[in-house]
Curated annotation (Swiss-Prot):
Protein family: Belongs to the aconitase/IPM isomerase family. LeuC type 1 subfamily.
Name of the molecule in the record: 3-isopropylmalate dehydratase large subunit
Alphabetic keyword roster: 4Fe-4S, Amino-acid biosynthesis, Branched-chain amino acid biosynthesis, Iron, Iron-sulfur, Leucine biosynthesis, Lyase, Metal-binding
Function noted in UniProt: Catalyzes the isomerization between 2-isopropylmalate and 3-isopropylmalate, via the formation of 2-isopropylmaleate.
HAMAP family tied to this protein: LeuC_type1 (MF_01026)
Signal sequence, start to end: none
Pathway: Amino-acid biosynthesis; L-leucine biosynthesis; L-leucine from 3-methyl-2-oxobutanoate: step 2/4
């Protein structure tokens, strides 16, 4: 029977499936961080259980840490408590932790692939909704809740119901200046933020194949923003080249055997998908969100839609509420919107490719007078090291940006990098919900190049019209 890639991954990890019951899956890799793991470890202690497979779990500090200091003792409040708890719990159980004293530390979905912990064919879970990022490698990866974190620590398994399969094909090649972020925002704009509900999405097509692994991670990272359980891209030579010689990747004959297996990880030609969506790559322009969910997005040259012209009453009400919060009116041209802050970072867009794109825009330019702050936050210590080796940090600083240490930073209002009330931000993160970047903060999701350009010109511009240096 022909199968989709998702079906192959799911079926090959079933440990036990009783008739009429939810299957139990084996979990190859478990990634943890300081926010969703403390209660899970407490649960283990209360039940007098041990971590079943210590070598399958890896931790990092990212969500609540400061991007300005690297000393745990200088952290404050809840952040300090969470970080110290993670340190205590990993030491007590023998779990490998990439803490803030190491250059390997970083955002969990940047650190995992960098270290070769993310491999094709795996099941990967983390107490974080953007775990779908790892699906870029042909792994079945999804976020889980804290009680499930405890269950995986104790059993290395997880009950998981089958999802539907969706194929999203992006045909042809994108135009110059169009990035992975534009592709995924255009997809979400077409499907809406609920279009993938109940599905695992496989992204395919020439435009997807042309992406680097960094770009593919950006696409899969935001699969959750269209309601999908997970996102997948079948592994290929681009995948193998990225993984070769990574610290935790197979070596020698094991590598050869692994690649031979990985090459089988693709949907069969006659596999049946429950839902199929197609986009033409040539039609995708630079994207900017105008509302309070990632599906409220249009091309930079368009005007904000009029809610009264929306046939769906739910969509109309959502748009009206979003415009009231975001402080904009229907018919406004996106290129007339000024920004107060710029954030370049997050598990969506904080890798070296993203920073290079931002630097190409900022080189030789200065921050616009109306822009209060530009934060550039690398996704890991290794990304930071590489960026500084290339001199990107000097470009950012010369342009008036702040060059920070690795962390989730302003993606979410959980640390000390936040927007002020009613400030407007051009952000490379993945969510533009109300208050996501700080109380009453207003977020517009864009690519790294678009964010950098907004910082230099003080408003949204079409990156295709900006000279790159």
């Amino acid at each position: 029977m022909a199968k989709t890639l998702y079906e192959k991954l799911f079926d090959s990890h079933i440990v036990y499936e009783a008739e009429g019951e939810t299957p139990i899956l084996y979990i190859n890799r478990h990634l943890i961080h300081e926010v969703t793991s403390p209660q899970a470890f407490d649960g283990l202690r209360v039940a007098n259980r041990q971590v079943r497979q210590v070598n399958k779990t890896f931790g990092t500090m990212d969500h609540s840490i400061s991007t300005q200091v690297r000393d745990v003792n200088k952290l404050e409040g809840q952040a300090k408590i969470q970080v110290l708890e993670l340190d205590k719990n990993t030491k007590a159980t023998g779990i490998k932790l990439f803490d803030i004293t190491t250059k390997e530390q970083g955002i969990v979905h940047v650190m995992g692939p960098e270290q070769g912990l993310t491999l094709p064919g795996m099941t990967i879970v983390c107490g974080d909704s953007h775990t779908a990022t790892h699906g870029a490698f042909g792994a079945l990866a999804f976020g889980i809740g804290t009680s499930e974190v405890e269950h995986v620590l104790a059993t290395q398994t997880l009950k998981q119901a089958r999802a539907k399969s969706m194929k999203i094909e992006v045909r042809g090649k994108v135009a110059s200046g169009i990035t992975a972020k534009d592709i995924i925002l255009a997809i979400i704009g077409k499907t809406t933020m609920a279009g993938g509900t109940g599905h695992v999405v496989e992204f395919c097509g020439e435009a997807i194949r042309d992406l680097s692994m960094e770009g593919r991670m950006t696409v899969c990272n935001m699969a959750i923003e269209m309601g999908a359980k997970a996102g997948l891209i079948a592994p290929d030579e681009t995948t193998f080249a990225y993984l070769k010689d990574r610290p935790h990747a197979p070596k020698g004959k094991d590598w050869d055997d692994a690649v031979a297996y990985w090459k089988t990880l693709k949907s069969d030609d006659d596999a049946q998908f429950d839902t199929v969506v197609t986009l033409e790559a040539k039609d995708i322009a630079p994207q900017v969100t105008w509302g309070t969910n990632p599906g409220q997005v249009i091309s930079v040259n368009e005007t904000i839609p009029n809610p009264q012209e929306m046939a769906d009453p739910v969509q109309r009400a959502s748009a009206e509420k979003a415009l009231h919060y975001i402080g904009l009116e229907a018919g406004t041209n996106l290129k007339d919107i000024k920004v107060d802050q710029v954030f370049i970072g997050s598990c969506t867009n904080s890798r070296i490719e993203d920073l290079r794109a931002a630097a190409a825009v900022m080189k030789g330019r200065k921050k616009a007078d109306n822009v209060k702050r530009i934060l550039v936050v690398p996704g890991s210590g290794l990304v930071k090291e590489q960026a500084e080796k290339e001199g990107l940090d000097k470009i950012f600083i010369a342009a008036g940006a702040e060059w920070r240490n690795p962390g989730c930073s302003m993606c979410l209002g959980m640390n000390d990098d936040r927007l002020g009330e009613w400030e407007r931000c051009a952000s490379t993160s993945n969510r533009n919900f109300e208050g996501r970047q700080g109380r009453n903060g207003r977020t517009h999701l864009v690519s790294p190049a678009m964010a950098a350009a907004a910082g230099m010109f003080g408003k949204f511009v079409d990156i295709r019209e900006v000279a790159l240096n």
